[in-house]
Amino acid sequence: MELRTFNAMAPLHVMHYQNSSIEEVADWNLFRRQLKESKKMGIDGISVDVWWGMVEKDGDNIFHWEYYQKIFSEIISNGLEIIPILSFHSFDPGPNSAFRAPIPNWVWKYLAEKSGLNEIDLKYISEEKGKDDALLYSDEFVSLWADEWVMPQYSEFMEEFLREFQNDLDSFQEINISCGPTGELRYPSYSSHDGGSYPNRGRMQCFSKPAIQNYREYLKADSFIHPSELISELEKGNYSDHGVERLLKWYNLSLMNHGNRMLKECIRIFPETIPIGFKIPGIHWKIADPETPRIAEITCGLIDGTEMNGEGAYSNSLRMVLKDLPLERIILHFTCLEQNNSDLNSDSVKHFSRAKDLVYDVSSASKNIGIKIKGENSLSQNLRHEEAWFRIQSAIEHGNYSGLTIMRLNDVTFGNKLGNQEYSRIIRQF
């Protein structure tokens, strides 16, 4: 039987940036204690966000690796492996946050110059409009329709990372690549900047100039209907309408092709001994909505609405994202292992969630395609409930999951006694 891996996520950033050296020392001391406890529990590795917005914040090709030299050294010295996440997405809760890592300011200016577009058109623009018809956009991730200009920047970052940590490669369990907001292959359809959020349907994100131009090219000689004219049919769940069907196929294909480009670059740059991982989110609400089934997954770009069976829908998408790639090198990470289905009595309250079904559908899809899948929890607060741990255990035992990553380290060490006990028990069992 194949060995499973049991990992935990490091904090977003060790130390709080409040100009207190005492606080910094305390944070690093706590992190060291967490690492020692992790090793004792049998945890294999620690995943670490390598923030683009931190490393290259000062300008093109000006890299700051000191923090990562330190944190990697701490992890290795405790006998643990590292799972670097090349985090090209933004983490920016706002100016008063203890830690921020927005996409570097210079990136938007650089891409605008290269492309001839304005900065807003390099971002995902929503179907929704603001006051006085203002465009609503997300700057969590550079739009996939700007890949032509931003991909060389991603490649430079990867190559520089490889040079900097050449001597640590043996300690890398795998390298993960961020393909969208929060590091996941998706559109920012529920990021709350435009009214799209859990548990509603989400918002389509294909209204920038390069997106519309790309859609026109996709249609070729077929008649063009602007996406804004199709939203009302989408909201009715009329996915088989000719215009809606074409739009959703293109929308899903565009995202999967973007994921393929990102993975292809990783495969090209990093040694073949290192597996490459990517993540898709568990968009579990609205799956069983009788009027608009699976609409939240559709606006997120994960599926195209032609196939309502979860296993089939995700098999179709995975085939696209993994086209012409060496499957033996790639690991899919999927979130929401700890969540349950809503039932018929609670469906309207729990938003027609089929989280548990989705966990098994996506694992079956990965098995169909022939790639390894590992799981994650989606919310740390769920780890305070025993039944969540039983669902995680069941997914590993009866699903196709070959590993688990818990978000975050504190939730299985000193911040959650139940989490510490249950993760230790699961690791011992497997």
Language-model segments: residues:
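Boundary/entry segment of secreted carbohydrate-active catalytic domains
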Residues: 1-38, 49
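Structural preference for beta-strand elements that scaffold enzyme active sites
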Residues: 3-9, 45-47, 79-85, 172-176, ...
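Active-site beta-loop-alpha junctions enriched in small/polar residues
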Residues: 11-15, 51-53, 87-91, 177-182, ...
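Short, solvent-exposed loop/turn and secondary-structure capping segments
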Residues: 19-25, 58, 87, 94-99, ...
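Well-ordered, non-membrane alpha-helical segments in soluble/globular domains
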Residues: 24-34, 62-71, 148-160, 254-264, ...
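Aromatic-lined substrate-binding rim segments of carbohydrate-active enzymes
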Residues: 28-125, 152-169, 173, 193-196, ...
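Substrate-binding cleft of secreted/luminal carbohydrate-active enzymes
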Residues: 81-83, 87-91, 310-430
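Polysaccharide-binding and catalytic clefts of secreted carbohydrate-active enzymes
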Residues: 109-323
